[in-house]
Amino acid sequence: MARIPFEELPDHGRLWIFPCSRTLSGREAEVFIETVYSFLDDWKAHGLPLRCAGELRDSQFLIVGVDVDSELPSGCSIDSLVNRLRTLGSDIGISLIDHTPVWYREGADIQSVSRSQFRALAKAGTVTLATKVFDTSLTRIHDLRTGDLERPASDMWHGRVFFQDQVTA
């Protein structure tokens, strides 16, 4: 078994974030993460097991990390992960591969809207520079550990793109 607890991965480890197109229900989340764990238990690169970890945050974000000191993930191993997630998503009626929406927190809930919809929400003042948004493009475990996944829009690229008139250089 190559899967390890997430906290055992080094800060410089490789990270992937897969946003679920909707929040998973309790039982659905359990089945989902068990299926992911089953895949990660056997995940290999060039026949060698990858020391890896996975977790589901907020029943919405699948986080997968790899200890690159142990074995580097190959293009084929990454493709196998993406293909498995695409199939799993299809089986339960969600998308896990689409990073184009903007993910933001509204109270206790996580919302997902198109970029044009988020721009309209920003223009209307419904979302602000203080709105917490999610950066699903993180690639290092360190960034996840320092809280870069969820931060105010003012601290992310979202602030520059959607609040241009409110952000100073």
What does each model-found stretch correspond to?
Residues 50-53, 91-101:
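Short, flexible active-site-proximal loops enriched in glycine and acidic residues
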Residues 12-58:
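Long, hydrophobic N-terminal alpha-helical segment
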Residues 1-16:
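N-terminal catalytic cores of peptidoglycan-degrading enzymes
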Residues 97-169:
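Terminal interaction module
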Residues 21-24, 67-73:
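A generic structural motif
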Residues 69-96:
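Helix-adjacent hinge/juxtasegments
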